[in-house]
Amino acid sequence: MSLNDYPQQVNKRRTFAIISHPDAGKTTITEKVLLYGQAIQTAGSVKGKGSSTHAKSDWMEMEKQRGISITTSVMQFPYNDCLVNLLDTPGHEDFSEDTYRTLTAVDSCLMVIDSAKGVEERTIKLMEVTRLRDTPILTFMNKLDRDIRDPMELLDEVENVLNIHCAPITWPIGCGKLFKGVYHLYKDETYLYQTGQGHTIQEKRVIKGLDNPELDAAVGDDLAQQLRDELELVQGASNEFDLDAFLQGELTPVFFGTALGNFGVDHFLDGLTQWAPAPQSRQADSRAVASSEQKLTGFVFKIQANMDPKHRDRVAFMRVVSGKYEKGMKLRHVRLGKDVVISDALTFMAGDRSHAEEAYAGDIIGLHNHGTIQIGDTFTQGEELKFTGIPNFAPELFRRIRLKDPLKQKQLLKGLVQLSEEGAVQVFRPLMNNDLIVGAVGVLQFDVVVSRLKSEYNVEAIYENINVATARWVECSDAKKFDEFKRKNEQNLALDGGDNLTYIAPTMVNLNLAQERYPDVKFFKTREH
């Protein structure tokens, strides 16, 4: 590779994720985005369970049955001279841990809001995570083909609830059955909407200028006048787009449209490729690593099992932070202090995997993992580095898991430890007995674990309720005090899947008492990988 080519390759990359509340239309948007990137020719819209066209980005058996995206997949496609990497994050109620970690691997996010509902609780939680790194956010107000709330009201809500300034880029003309299109504030153009074009890219029907009589003819006098009145208000009351404020995560450009009707998606893609940052530098324990550096570095943010039902394989997803991956490269697996030759890394088009010949900073590659790679691992070309900031969250829900067939205890433990390494669930083994406690951030994770134990490890397991309120990782620098703490609290201590000591609290009162009683012991709600 010529040295001149490298900065050009990195600068054309855009790596982003979509964040939304369940059912705000995220999977549909993913489909339409890929359609624009020509990755798929007709968008397989996510329909009911019986339909054979399942969404292209949902690919685990259980996802197909339920019509939700459970695992984060990665898709790369070209758009406007850029190469876009889209990380699909599970939007459903519970898949939070995986989703949170995915947000550590992107340089910008698209926030999708259901315009009939406004800002919802899951969106608030995800926005908090993007705030940790001030990730730039673009906003798409979706579902304009339905009856929606007043657009000004939606902008106010985003500003007040999510504490970010809004700069409308497009503005809707009507909504529901009367939805006619959007006006672009910065190009002074109106884009007209046609129904029934959801599966293909619409022909652009553009009217130049706000005072153009063609506009009145196309949308009707009333709506045209309403648009002009609203725009006067908007231009007086809202923020102008400011690139620096956007890059610092203080302001979000807002686009209106309908993903199902495939309208408005290209508007935010244009914004993404024009404004969103190219791959950024990242903090490691000893220094910051710039994306312009020639030596390869990267970190693993997710592990996924069985992307290929024919093989019991697991793939570790690695975000390339700097340098270039080339087939057959020797990389240092820093945590293990081992050098490995990576000859068969993967690139992704969800579920269709192709072997990567090369990848640059900003790209995501898949490494085959036979149980040696963990979330948070760093790979380099020899430098002893560890990237920081990839979190594990204390679970909020707990159940005891046991076998229908007690002879399969070994398989059960193996399955649970593997699933916990993958971040699907957390496992705790109490020091006092042989129980296995499963901890999750949401209820759906429990179902996923049982169905995967059955299909991948041939183990039938059932849950029982258990009296656990929360868990905290514990550490103490004073060995003597720690020993006393361990001796007196043995009945509440457990090891997690990575053999880290954890305090399992039956009630919050119990936890508070323990924290008061042992001020030298640190109780952690999150743990960095």
From Swiss-Prot:
Entry keyword GTP-binding: yes
Record has Iron as a keyword: no
A Pfam match: GTP_EFTU
InterPro entries documented for this protein: EF-G-like_DII, EFG_III/V, G_TR_CS, P-loop_NTPase, PrfC, RF3_C, RF3_dom_3_sf, RF3_GTP-bd
Stretches assigned to the tr-type G domain: 11-280
Gene Ontology cellular component terms for the protein in this record: cytosol
GO biological process, alphabetically ordered: regulation of translational termination
Keywords: Cytoplasm, GTP-binding, Nucleotide-binding, Protein biosynthesis
GO function terms (MF aspect): GTP binding; GTPase activity; guanosine tetraphosphate binding; translation release factor activity, codon nonspecific; translation release factor activity, codon specific
Function, in words: Increases the formation of ribosomal termination complexes and stimulates activities of RF-1 and RF-2. It binds guanine nucleotides and has strong preference for UGA stop codons. It may interact directly with the ribosome. The stimulation of RF-1 and RF-2 is significantly reduced by GTP and GDP, but not by GMP.
Family: Belongs to the TRAFAC class translation factor GTPase superfamily. Classic translation factor GTPase family. PrfC subfamily.
Name of the protein in its database record: Peptide chain release factor 3
Species of the source: Pasteurella multocida (strain Pm70)
Gene name linked to the record: prfC
